[in-house]
From Swiss-Prot:
Protein name in UniProt: Photosystem II reaction center protein T
Gene: psbT
Domain of life: Eukaryota
PANTHER family per the UniProt record, alphabetical: PHOTOSYSTEM II REACTION CENTER PROTEIN T, PTHR36411
Assembly with partners or alone: PSII is composed of 1 copy each of membrane proteins PsbA, PsbB, PsbC, PsbD, PsbE, PsbF, PsbH, PsbI, PsbJ, PsbK, PsbL, PsbM, PsbT, PsbY, PsbZ, Psb30/Ycf12, at least 3 peripheral proteins of the oxygen-evolving complex and a large number of cofactors. It forms dimeric complexes.
Protein's organism: Saruma henryi
GO cellular component, one term: photosystem II reaction center
Lineage: Eukaryota, Viridiplantae, Streptophyta, Embryophyta, Tracheophyta
Amino acid sequence: MEALVYTFLLVSTLGIIFFAIFFREPPKILTKKTK
C-alpha cells in the first residue's frame, strides 16, 4: 500500500513538472526530436 502511494506521488510530481515546462515554452525541441 505504501509503495503504491509513493509511486503515485512520484508520477504526479513528474507530471506537474512536465506540464509546467511544456506550457512555459513552446515544444520546439520535442517536435525536432520526433521528426
